[in-house]
A protein has these predicted regions:
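Membrane-interfacial terminal anchoring regions of lipid-handling membrane enzymes
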Residues: 1-407
């Protein structure tokens, strides 16, 4: 069988960045998704990014990956700021009608294991798949040769900036590596391979003024956090069933439910100081450097501090919790981590009961007498003790501070 030419394979993987799609998606994000999920969205450090762009620098944005909202928050803001950026996205996201939307938003496909193509159009792809036609297959080995050529086209001929999520998790039992969102809440290590390839492409293109921009997207509460426990478990749901429910919950149920209950949370996006592309440092060391730079940008909310200060216990006296909070705050201040939400206008630490009350409002879904929605409790407290009813969710937010506090 004759192999398809390389240009055909690259066309199947490429983005279709266009203003019409980005403008439409931006409108939906700002008037429904962001409005439904978040009470406050703050961007820090974007002015310096604009200055770098005006100076002619090529920018590679390296964020941690906590939520599906990460790329939408970033691409929406970058697009509205005139920073033309394309996104490296996993092949599992390009399904059905979402394929042209993602490509129109500047997403190009990266193949993790194997991807089968039946047509360049998603409708014909589904029809050809149903009819049993022979597909074009791109496996991991083939993609390792195509990836540098994708980047050369994007960074060279097209002149875009790049947004990459290089974080990965390793299954403790099977050893399988998973790229994408952190299901555990941990601040995942970054793949050295991504930095090896990008740096080699920059060198081949003779782009010497490129900078890696660390980005931290910190959520007071991740919109789709309740899904992650099931995604980590070996359930009977097929991949496509998980995919459909994931997107239904993340982009429809979560915004509607949080708007109805008025349980919107805060999110902060911080752009850090640019790190010049260094062609001499080892990729593993550079990946750890970028991870550390991202870690320094996080913002600590009441939820992360309280859940981490419980030390994995289900019941804890308030006195002991207050002592743990003070000890953790001391460590966070030593690392110069942003803890501003924990302090009032006069610079005083918020009372413990006030912080617990905030967490209760965000993490306890009360019963609605008008519209029956799922009811559950994560945390409760009385005069003397704090009780955890959802240890998996508490552990997820506790893990968010482990990387910086364990340094």
């Amino acid at each position: 069988m004759r192999k398809p030419p390389e240009r055909t394979l690259l066309r199947l993987l490429h983005h279709h960045w266009n203003r019409r799609t980005l403008s439409s998606v931006s409108y939906i994000c700002e008037h429904f998704l962001f409005k439904g999920c978040f009470s406050e969205i703050e961007f820090v450090g974007l002015d310096k990014v604009r200055q770098k762009l005006k100076a002619g620098k090529r920018l590679i944005f390296i964020p941690d990956h906590q939520s599906e909202y990460d790329w939408m928050l970033l691409q929406n803001k970058l697009y509205r700021s005139g920073i033309k950026t394309v996104i490296q996205a996993g092949d599992n996201l390009f399904v059905g009608p979402l394929d042209p939307i993602l490509r129109g938003c500047g997403a190009f496909m990266s193949v993790r294991q194997e991807k089968r193509f039946y047509s360049v159009h998603w409708i014909y792809d589904l029809l050809a798949r149903a009819m049993g036609q022979r597909p074009i297959v791109i496996d991991r080995e083939q993609y390792s040769r195509l990836y540098p050529k994708q980047l050369k086209r994007i960074l060279g001929r097209e002149g875009y900036n790049l947004l990459v999520f290089p974080g990965y998790e390793t299954d403790p039992y099977s050893g399988e590596v998973k790229y994408g969102r952190s299901y555990t809440g941990m601040f995942n290590p970054l793949s050295p391979y991504v930095f090896i390839t990008i740096s080699k492409v920059l060198k081949d293109l003779d782009i010497r003024d490129a900078e890696y921009i660390p980005v931290a997207v910190t959520y007071e509460r991740v919109p789709e956090d309740v899904l992650f426990r099931e995604f980590r478990a070996a359930t009977r749901r097929t991949k496509i069933a998980k995919y459909i429910y994931d997107h239904y919950y993340t982009f429809f149920k979560a915004p509607f439910s949080k708007e109805l209950h008025q349980e919107k949370s805060r999110v902060c996006v911080k752009f850090g100081k640019g790190v010049p592309a260094n062609f001499s440092i080892k990729a593993r060391d550079f990946a750890e450097l970028m991870r550390h730079e991202i870690g320094k940008l996080i913002r600590v909310y009441e939820s992360t501090l309280i859940f981490h200060s419980l030390n994995g216990r289900f019941v804890l006296p308030k006195k002991e919790l207050a002592e743990n909070i003070q000890a953790n705050l001391k460590k966070l201040k030593e690392h110069k981590i942003d803890c501003s939400p924990l302090y009032g206008p006069r610079g005083r630490l918020l009372p413990l009961d006030r912080m617990l009350g905030r967490v209760e409002r965000l993490f306890n879904y009360s019963e609605s007498p008008i519209i029956p929605l799922k009811t559950y409790r994560t945390l409760e407290h009385d005069q003397y003790e704090v009780f955890i009813h959802n240890p998996h969710l508490a552990a997820y937010y506790s893990n968010k501070l482990k990387y910086m506090l364990d340094l």
